[in-house]
């Protein structure tokens, strides 16, 4: 919640499936996020407003969202789940407006979140790694799109000449 409290009884259905997967021998888990918690979003919702091209995550909550992701990872790791990957953004090329949980992202916003998440993983002493880039279609990884969203991500994130979006040097980025 807005005070930093966690209710671990929420998302009981997802937790049930994790328990069953572990019971049947799954030994690696990936945590991903559709949206930041609403207390961290610009509009107070888990979806973006129409016409928004950048992230719905408020500029002053990148570190908070990263901490939320790592606190959640630590909680489930402590419960015996081998959380190996954290995917902080889901299909960032889409609008994700009313009726669908999610957020559009630009490469700049993703890189900013990745840097905060890298710090938080290190601070919490986790072994999980960041899974990026993330795309709804293969072409978003290597082509420019019509929207000013997460496109041509391989170039943006891994070419050292892209100083605002380069994340290839992050310690906790999956290679």
Name each model feature, range by range.
Residues 9, 16, 123, 155-175:
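Glycoside hydrolase catalytic-domain groove-lining segments
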